[in-house]
Amino acid sequence: MVRGALRGGRPMRGGIRPPFKKTFVPRHPFDLTLAEVFFPKVPSAGAVDDSALTAALLKRNQDLSPTPSEQTAIGNLVTKVQAVLDNLVVAPGDLTTCQLEEVRQVGSFKKGTILTGNNVADVVVILKTLPTKEAVDALAKKVEADLKASMKTEVLTKGDQHTVQIHERGFDIANVHAKVRILIATLPQNLRKLEPEIHLDHKLMQSHLAAIRHTRWFEENAHHSSIKVLIRILKDLTRRFDAFSPLSAWMLDLIAHLAIMNNPSRQALPINLAFRRVFQLLSAGLFLPGSAGITDPTEPGHIRVHTAMTLEQQDVCCYTSQTLLRVLAHGGYKHILGLEGNTSVVREMSVWNGVCISPLTAVYEKPTDKKEGDLEEDIDMIENENEEEGSDDGAE
């Protein structure tokens, strides 16, 4: 008989028990917009004049929006490709290597948040059959042939000639002016049947199906014009500030929707207030370990979107937002928007209206003796420590 146990294998009272792991309860960071009733403004201070900031935001949005010629070029190409794919769903003809179930536009072009100079539209093609590499090749050739046949009566310039390029996600159809990315997916019940040597990558298939859910949610919940303006400005920030580059397009969609629509009045906030609120939330630790963050509304299981970032990336995003929030508070919005100067304000000391602002530095340091596989343990440890200490999760 095993020591410490009764006959029959039942453990004795007081025997060795597994260590108790406290349940992680995420907390919401401080949000001045939601807590404004508890922090009334000083009457003598008066309202802040943000007219200059509002005008700068609208001007920057106009600069970042695609020109009418760009919109026309990408719109025409998308219409032609969509017509060919829709026809293959109904009448596949001699295409026998795969069967199409559905064709859906996704991404920035469909949402109306595309940036100028990035004339790329995304279309997800869901296959009834398994997505083999041979099937993708055959589909690309069929689409190219049908596209040429549909345009045989048109007079095409050299720049209007289409090229097809196959890649790991599907294939691209492009001309000099625009490009349409065909992203291949399959029915959810087929995902478990995929084999790495034969079919396209399982994770890529999941991401393409997720893109459909993201676009559907956006059309239903984030169609307000102010949200699209803010998303376009945030996308530009991710291009110019390295600290924000880990933020995915889906994260930007969600934080823009949160900043504008999640308030006591349930009415869209003005663009200037929403722009400030984004930096306030990130500075307060919205995307730090221990924070409730933003739950992905399209996924089961209460997944916080910022957990896709590493701990270093979460820290850099937070302290960079804190620096930029201080710059914004003292009138440095033109440097943040890229209308003047450069991005050195997050790396070098700067002076704004007599106020000296020094950039903040990293708080989190990754242990050098741990492997990449220990990252989840680090996150759990930090979140549990924060829970016990009752900190505000702000990387000051």
From Swiss-Prot:
GO terms for molecular function: DNA binding; double-stranded RNA binding. InterPro entries: DZF_dom (IPR006561), DZF_dom_C (IPR049402), DZF_dom_N (IPR049401), ILF2 (IPR052134), NT_sf (IPR043519). The keyword Nucleus applies. It is found in: Nucleus. Its main location: nucleus. SMART domains: DZF. GO terms for biological process: mRNA splicing, via spliceosome; positive regulation of DNA-templated transcription. Keywords: Activator, DNA-binding, Nucleus, Transcription, Transcription regulation. It holds the Pfam family DZF_N. Residues 367-396 are annotated as: Disordered. Residues 22-379 form the DZF domain. It comes from the Eukaryota. One of its GO terms (cellular component) is nucleolus. SUPFAM superfamilies: Nucleotidyltransferase (SSF81301). Residues 374-396 have a biased composition (Acidic residues). The keyword Cell inner membrane does not apply. May regulate transcription of undefined genes. PANTHER family: INTERLEUKIN ENHANCER-BINDING FACTOR, INTERLEUKIN ENHANCER-BINDING FACTOR 2. This is Interleukin enhancer-binding factor 2 homolog. It comes from Drosophila melanogaster (Fruit fly).
